[in-house]
Amino acid sequence: YLLVTAHYDHLGKTALGIYHGANDNGSGTVSVIEIARALGALKPHPRRTIVFITLFGEEEGLLGSYYYAHHPLFPLKDTIVDINLEQMGRTDDPAGKKAGEFTVTGPSYSNVASILGEAAKAEDIGVYTRKDADDYFDRSDNYSFAQFGVISHTVVVAVDFPDYHGLGDNWEKIDFANMAKVDRGVAAGILRLANDADAPVWSNAPGAAIYRNAGR
């Protein structure tokens, strides 16, 4: 099995106003739906079953993914990877515009980033690496599955987009054309993971040891 996940909750409403969460994480939720629609229409079906899940409570402490990890519909011992989608719609980042590319959290922890990147080339999508990418590994729902030994990573377009957890995270700022293109690249990577004879593997990076040795 493969998991493809995204959280659909956000911060809600406060005295300051409504936090719409269009990019974080409406965009990730839409990406899960669209990738599921595209891959679900393929004939023949992929070699491995792909399970698409939208999760609640990420902003409250990864609650939805924590629950699924403890009550899986399909055995985690038979789950080879989780690809978690976050902030797929905005390209504006203080480090420069992130059009036509995405990054993967914890890239040194497994060979998943290289698999996704190689497959995404067919859609003219690149993968960029942040120096602090490993530091973001435990910041989203992938972390719940990694604690059970499932290779899990979060895919992000613009990590530090303006309006993060702000009132200005509105749909008008989403780059829909780029989002569709990146989704196609990510879908190509997911399909490769689903069809490859070899499952992805944890690396020997020191930071991966705790997950590599986690009990299933």
Regions from the PLM with identified roles:
Residues 4-61, 186:
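Alpha-helical metal-binding/catalytic segments enriched in His/Glu/Asp
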Residues 22-30, 44, 59-63, 106-111, ...:
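Soluble non-cytosolic domains of exported or imported proteins
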Residues 29, 33-36, 62-69, 113, ...:
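Extracytoplasmic/secreted envelope proteins and their assembly/folding machinery
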Residues 48, 126-135, 197-205:
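Surface-exposed patches in mature extracellular/periplasmic domains of secreted proteins
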Residues 55-154, 158-160:
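Metal-dependent peptidase/peptidase-like ectodomains
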